[in-house]
Amino acid sequence: MKLVTAIIKPFKLDEVREALSGIGVQGITVTEVKGFGRQKGHTELYRGAEYVVDFLPKVKLEAAVDDALVEQVIEAIEGAARTGKIGDGKIFVYDVEQVIRIRTGETGKEAL
């Protein structure tokens, strides 16, 4: 099993969610986060004064999936989240040792 974590632009969340649902991903966790990568933030003008915005709003989504589904999940996220501009985000894939559904006690793939 793998945990696929993606940091994406907030306005792309609905498209990514639909793409993941379309390939059979049954659950995701979404967290609003802030950060920066190569784009390093930007400056904004507010009431005549310039402000530096160091951390940009992003959305982190996490999905625990079976190994057989990982490549499809990556392709779905890439396809739905890509704008072709700096700041589209990143995808990370981690090994998951164990999953337990608290309600039923199911473990492994059955708990996903």
Q: Where does each model-flagged region fall?
A:
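Positively charged, small/polar-rich N-terminal and surface patches that mediate targeting and assembly
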Residues: 1-112
